[in-house]
Amino acid sequence: VGAAMGQLIASNRSDTWLTRLIDMEYWLACNEERAAQARFGAVMCCCGPCAIYRRTALLLLLDQYETQMFRGKRSDFGEDRHLTILMLAAGYRTEYVRDAVAATVVPDTLRPYLRQQLRWARSTYRDTLLALRLLPRLDRYLTLDVIAQNIGSLLLAISMISGFLQIVLTATAPWQACFVIASMTMVRCSVAAIRAREL
C-alpha cells in the first residue's frame, strides 16, 4: 500500500445549506465511491486533507510529483489526485480507511465553491489522461468507473446547457434534457445501491 485516505467531513457543515450539501457530497464520495474503488485495489484520488502516504514510496516519486507538467506547462493544481495516480503507476495500491476521519472547512458561499469545483474538474480531466495508461492493469470495474465519471459529467453539462438554451430560445420545457438528467441520476443511484450491497 502506497497511500490511504480516510473519511472527509465538513467541520462547518451546519453553517449554511451549501455546507450541508458539501458534507453530504463528501460522505457519498468517501463511503460510496472511494470505498468501492478500494474494494478493487485502487482509490483513484486520496483526498489531500485526509490522505497519508508511505514515506519510501513518496521519496521515489517526489521528483515526478514536483515537476509535473501538462501540455508543456508547469502544473500545480490537483496535487492529491496527481500523487495518487503516480502511486498507482509505480505499482502501489491505494486504500480507503473508513475509521480514519478528518475534518476540513468547506466553502460556505457559491462563488468560492464553484471556483474550487472548476479547479478540481481541471485536475480530474488532466489526471484521467494519465490514468488511462493504468486502466489495463486495474480491475474492469475501475475502468468503467473512471470512464463513467468523465463521460457522465460531460453529458450532464451538455444536457443542462441544451435545456437552458431550449427554455431561452423556444420558451418550451426541456423534457429531453430533464429525461437525460433523471436517467443519469437513476443510473448513479442504482450503481450506488449495487456497490453498497457488494461492500
Predicted feature locations:
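Membrane-embedded multi-pass helical conduit in multi-pass membrane proteins
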Residues: 145-199
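Non-transmembrane catalytic domains and loops of membrane-associated enzymes and transporters
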Residues: 1-138
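Serine/threonine-rich low-complexity intrinsically disordered regions
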Residues: 16, 54, 143, 173-174
